[in-house]
Amino acid sequence: MSHAPRYAELRCKSCFSFLEGASHPEELVGRAAELGLSALALADVNGLYGIVRAHAEAKRQGLPLIVGAELVVAGLAPGRPARLVLLAQDREGYAGLCRLVTRAHCGEGWTGAPERRERDAVAVPFEAVAAGARGLFALYPGADGDAVARLKDAFGRRAALAVARHRVAGEEARVLAARSAGRRLGVPVAVTNDVHTHARARQVLQDVLTCVRHGTTVDRAGRRLFPNAERTLKGPEELARLWSDFPEGLAAAADIADQCRFRMEAIRGEHPLPPVVVERGALAGGVEVATSSPAQAAREGARTATPSLSLRASLPAERPAAPAIEGCAASGPGLPAAGAGGGAAAAAATDRDGALAGMSLLRELVREGARWRYGGEPPEDVARQLARELELVESLGYASYFLTVWDVVRFARSRGILCQGRGSAANSAVCYVLGITSIDPVRMGLLFERFISAERGEPPDIDVDFEHERREEVLQYVYQRYGRDRAGMVCEVITYRGKSALRDVGKALGLSLGQVDRLAKLIGTYEDLGQVGPELLAQAGLDAADSERVRMTLALARELQGFPRHLSIHVGGFVITRRPLCETVPIEPAAMPGRTIVQWDKDDLAELDLLKVDLLGLGMLTALSRALALLARHRPAPASPTAVPHPDALATIPAEDPEVYEMLGRADSIGVFQVESRAQMSLAPRLRPRNFYDLVISVAIIRPGPIQGGMIHPYLRRRDGKEQVRYPYAPLEPVLARTLGVPLFQEQAMRLAVIAAGFTPGEADELRRVMTHRRSHEKLAAMKARLVAGMAERGISGADAEEIFKQLLGFAGYGFPESHAASFALLVYASAWLKRYHPAAFACALLNSQPMGFYAPHTLVEDAKRHGVEVRGVDVGCSGWESSLEGAAPGRPAAPGETAVLRVGLHAVRGLPRAVGEAILEARAAGPFGSVAELVRRARLSRAWLVRLAEAGALGALAPDRRDAVWRSLAVEADGGDLFAGLAPPEPEVALPAASAADEVSADFATTGLSVRGHPMALVRPGLGGDRIRTARELGRLPDRAPVEVAGLVIVRQRPETARGIVFVSLEDETGIANLVVMPDVYERFRPVVRGAPFLLARGRVERSGKVVNVRVDSVAPLALAPATGARARDFH
């Protein structure tokens, strides 16, 4: 009996070759293990995008994974650039591979922000390959003698030719030519299969991807498609039969694999951040002191759980010099040479040459920060916690990580940028006293182990939110400070979803554009294609039974879902390393100018325990910053009890204001951070928040974890005294007491597993990671035996054990960290306080911070008007570029004590460039405009922009009637090239019919997205048939199950994954918001109307639960009388 030869596949592409491979990396590794290959080399085109995913699967399978890439190389062979597979033999070779891939994308000698290239233009010159050949093995799938000779000169014995047999015409001649060149030049020849799929069944999808890549269809692709399915993974036996005339080719492949000993595990946890160094004496004022110190609040309010709202600190009299990065000038990007020491040794650096670095610096900053936070020496329990955390940070070597985040936060505050740390970092007392986070974890009783632990063996993760409009300043600071070769943003892999998959597959299969559009419109962006059945196809005029291509489109689109389409930028993850980052992971330009990204996403980095810093943008911080700035300029009278003494610091907002909680309790929360959704508004009257911790609960409870775990209703019943507080296991009471026996937070789930099931902290954290990982229900269910056995040992069995497991299983959706909820609750309170006491400034700030939040500008304006704010429209004579506050006199700032009026800014005019708006403001600064002609002449307005302003009703007193203004604007003619100096000779007066109120409102919405004249529903209500159709306000007075009809403008549509197909629609009318509940059967009957109509007429019954009122819908129809506003709903899936 003969044995199959050893064989390793050395040339394999995955779907991360972007439209060149039709299998996931995990599928290729799994199949290679099944086939008994001795090793597998993943060599995607110009990238290492999928290598970490393959590595994780290879570890599970016990299969050696060779790291490689297939580079497009210019100048290797005559004619067009050639393909060359490079395989890493050792760590040096891996670094060289990463550098070459980076060079291919970024070009030669890049130091600034390189320009992004199209994928087919990415290439590297052979001279660069030859110069970086050390530690790399080159595999050339060609036979050109000159190219082979050049490879041998550059790589020596680390070069080979690759041959393949795919049963196509002409390939035997290429195989013979390669073998001949190999013999002549002394270069080995290895058998490969140029793998594109893990199974032959994927060949149809491979053809589709080829068509997408070339912008053609399967009917027209011709020779661009592979003629068969032979480019799939094959086992040693099959290849031995195929290459029975050349067994040494298989042996050569196995030998090459044996030479490539580098594994991705070698870079696990590698590359600490560069140490931050501060000169002695520079710490005076180095930890910025808040205008209102948290210690003051502590002395006044003693040991309460309510944190200070300290997000922005005032600056010292003189801004301290920026700390240096070890090994470089403070102002330059230079860093220590590659190979400089790191790890715990670098992190524990001590004083030298009069400077502080590493743990010495961190300890000093913590001492200063603790005195700042607590107004002197910290309480004993805080001091103990700080000592414990510092000891662990030192032992794990993470001092530079904390110092780097501190440095970035320090920079932001020096520029007046509002910021706050959140997530698990809020569990850390060190982060709190460094000013990174705003939650006192000792007072809140938060679990430090959720953030970092010795047993877990993974790096900490600090997330910091910055004003989203100013985050770019922070990002560019990081690039400038550390250098682009040592800092890069984490990528996000944008994958095919339902619509995008349908569109690309449909086009490739030759469906008409009309068919593709109708098919794609059937589903939401994230909807499961498996739900597309005959009824939906019939709605689109498509019949799967009669169209084989429609059936294939659906089937192939389902296969394509989850494949990568392109890379985007992660919301804020930064990788910063001491040695060049491009020796650890390739870097490439992002689509956004000025940014570079690494080729791995956050999960890849986590798999390898590589540190990242998350610098995130948060719209609410922008809005809060803008609101405080408005208050600083338009401060109320000093006697006002709601005046902000120091409007540049949230720390000065009065805490625990009953009026704020009362407002939130009646669901008056449009625009308020995190609690403005329909679900949160439904919760608020039942929760009735009375203190800060109630806001923490509110933030966390409307999440998939608590919802799927069935925890919301038990908590509310216990809170109302309708259900007895009970604990399935008595020792759990200290863990669950604050949430009335119901686990709501990840930290509680971890403690529960330790106490009730005997898990170690490390096992509990593994449980936490399983619970919060997508699609992890199966993994969590597999742990049930371990959980149940541990609970049984402690006398927990039967119903109690099932209850605990059910609650834990709910967290597989998404359990919220308590620290994260507490950080967000700070912003809930701050935004609610501003809405309650300064609604004009708050609404103005929200308008100026768009896009953000849950509602479109027109809803924010309507809400402001319901709160007594006067809103004035866009006017070239009064408006700034942004919305602003003015007094009773149009265009004049509000005087102290005067009620502020909200003036909509020129930015609201759709399509108007900022440069045009600023030209108007610059001209107006010299004096008011006396006429339209003067406006045109002084602001150098073109006819197009003047017409745009006239259509928006923005010419104000210059032309009060909109139609007349448009007519006159069309008469503007050019004078002297691009200077539009005035009006044409007068034409006969034209008597234009007056616009109706409905026409005016429609024009407002069409041009600015909002109207200050009135709500569209107020205009059409008289034609709706008397009192039959109720207003949103009237719904609150109707009894439960009363039949009702409501109508309104659709402002939000939601179809949450946790709602089992239920759709929630919010309708706005002139009195408020009505919430519709559309059950799945009703949704299927009225899908096009629900998804597409801007105004709805809904019939159904009132559903009351306490003060919460919804309408359960029986039928819906478009509102025929509604004006054509062009208003856009915010749709969330």
UniProtKB/Swiss-Prot annotation:
Protein's UniProt keywords contain DNA repair: yes
Entry EC number(s): 2.7.7.7
Catalytic activities: DNA(n) + a 2'-deoxyribonucleoside 5'-triphosphate = DNA(n+1) + diphosphate
Any Gene Ontology CC annotation: cytoplasm
CDD domains from the UniProt entry: DnaE_OBF, PHP_PolIIIA_DnaE2
Disulfide pairings: none
Any one of the GO BP annotations: DNA replication
Short name of any one Pfam family annotated for the protein: DNA_pol3_alpha
Alphabetized InterPro entries for the sequence: DNA_pol3_alpha_NTPase_dom, DNA_pol3_alpha_thumb_dom, DNA_pol3_finger, DnaE2, DnaE2/DnaE/PolC, DNAPol_HHH, NA-bd_OB_tRNA, PHP_dom
Superkingdom as given in the UniProt entry: Bacteria
Gene Ontology molecular function terms on file: 3'-5' exonuclease activity; DNA-directed DNA polymerase activity; nucleic acid binding
Enzyme class: transferase
Swiss-Prot/TrEMBL keywords: Cytoplasm, DNA damage, DNA repair, DNA replication, DNA-directed DNA polymerase, Nucleotidyltransferase, Transferase
Keyword Transferase recorded: yes
Main localization category: cytoplasm
Name by which UniProt lists this protein: Error-prone DNA polymerase
Organism phylogeny: Bacteria, Pseudomonadati, Myxococcota, Myxococcia, Myxococcales
Gene name as annotated: dnaE2
